[in-house]
Amino acid sequence: MDALLQLKGIDKAFPGVKALSGAALNVYPGRVMALVGENGAGKSTMMKVLTGIYTRDAGSLLWLGKETTFNGPKSSQEAGIGIIHQELNLIPQLTIAENIFLGREFVNRFGKIDWKKMYAEADHLLAKLNLRFKSDKLVGELSIGDQQMVEIAKVLSFESKVIIMDEPTDALTDTETDSLFRVIRELKSQGRGIVYISHRMKEIFEICDDVTVFRDGQFIAEREVATLTEDSLIEMMVGRKLEDQYPHLDNAPGEIRLKVDNLCGPGVNDVSFVLRKGEILGISGLMGTGRTELMKVLYGAMPRTSGYVTLEGHEVVTRSPQDGLANGIVYISEDRKRDGLVLGMSVKENMSLTALDYFSRAGGSLKHKDEQQAVGDFIRLFNVKTPSMEQAIGLLSGGNQQKVAIARGLMTRPKVLILDEPTRGVDVGAKKEIYQLINQFKADGLSIILVSSEMPEVLGMSDRIIVMHEGHLSGEFTREQATQEVLMAAAVGKLNRVNQE
């Protein structure tokens, strides 16, 4: 089968770094090509070379059988290559239709915008994606998941022959993911080629036909997905066997440290649970069931309307995140780029931001040596891959950004560490490093709450698991009781089993 798009022998170097060396990628009509590799493997650089953001140092790009060079995203888009970025690229103050057709508005014979036609076309695109809202809605009123679907509708509006999807389901619910997969299958039947960049093995084996593996900027292999297992694919990605993906630590938890009684707040109804010293408590449930809201009410980022929280026997009232930090409760957000990190600031500044009290003199000036020492220690402990602590954090891979976000929380010396989706957007190698760090915190006696949409992660790492359904607690299970089936039954409200201590 002839490829729609073929990149061969692609080299790209930056000062001191060879980002791509002999990289290759083929995209075939009517097939989905997964592009996989650890963070820093060269996937993003390859996409930037393809779309003309970067100029390749060597190699060839064949588009529809002809040697081609794109001089920027506009030229590749007009040629028929659409890309859906992981970072949303929408204007919240405009409607869905205005975002989809921005700069390409329909005009009538009098030169005025044909609003009726534009909204009708946009509604048609949304209907193709099985979405329940109309295109006259403001983008800013949509959830992150729905905004992602608008991005997909926008690319579909270009009638692209090849569509690149970069972690497209990262913020989508299961229903939205099913809708996306239905659309991908429709696009395949129309003869379009899809590049599907993802860390999610389950999705790759469900929706992709072929897979291309990158490692350290090099092309490793192209295979049919049907010929692989998850383990063999991961081994190609990391270049080593991944023994025991979830390294659980069997240390018995200690006495009760945190007690939550009848907690209520936005999206949270009458939730009670306990957390012990040296325990990992998993929080499971479907998206939108109140898991993140519960954590934010506990931490002080959302208002508590009723209920009691005691920490080491003393009542805690958290009206703000500052109250949470002051009481020894740290929350690491699921959206590290919006709530967690300041991307334009350095690794050092991000890591020490919430712990400046520890590095300040009585007059308010900073003890820079102490700050540098502490940041350096955490960089070594967490194996953060960065040229220096002065590097802008936005230039680090997702896994290294997440390590910095967790390190920042630990700098305040907390008693309770809340990790909300700690491995989202993180490659398989960095995931294991984060799991090992979590076990280290547990061994040191830290109390950890692990919120995750990945059931194997919750099952593999937790000592005990509670499940949320529609703002309520619908189940509480020991590690031995918990299975994927039991957690899913509780998550959809078919099972209600809560053990109160």
UniProtKB/Swiss-Prot annotation:
- Pfam families per record: ABC_tran (PF00005)
Q: Which InterPro entries match?
A: AAA+_ATPase, ABC_carbohydrate_import_ATPase, ABC_transporter-like_ATP-bd, ABC_transporter-like_CS, P-loop_NTPase
- Describe the location of the ABC transporter domain by residue ranges: 5-241, 252-495
| Membrane topology recorded in Swiss-Prot or TrEMBL | Peripheral membrane protein
Query: What GO cellular component entries does it have?
Result: plasma membrane
Q: What is its main location?
A: membrane
One GO MF term on file is: ABC-type D-ribose transporter activity
The protein's location, in the record's own words, is: Cell inner membrane
Q: What is its EC number?
A: 7.5.2.7
Q: Which SMART domains match?
A: AAA
Keyword Repeat in the entry? The reply is yes
Sorted keywords for this record are:
ATP-binding, Cell inner membrane, Cell membrane, Membrane, Nucleotide-binding, Repeat, Sugar transport, Translocase, Transport
UniProt entry tagged with the keyword Repeat: yes
Q: Which family does it belong to?
A: Belongs to the ABC transporter superfamily. Ribose importer (TC 3.A.1.2.1) family.
Quaternary state and partners of this protein? The complex is composed of an ATP-binding protein (RbsA), two transmembrane proteins (RbsC) and a solute-binding protein (RbsB).
Q: Which NCBIfam families match?
A: PRK10762.1 (NF008030)
Function of this protein?
Answer: Part of the ABC transporter complex RbsABC involved in ribose import. Responsible for energy coupling to the transport system.
* Full protein name: Ribose import ATP-binding protein RbsA
- The scientific name of the source species is Salmonella typhi
Query: What gene name is given for the protein in this entry?
Result: rbsA
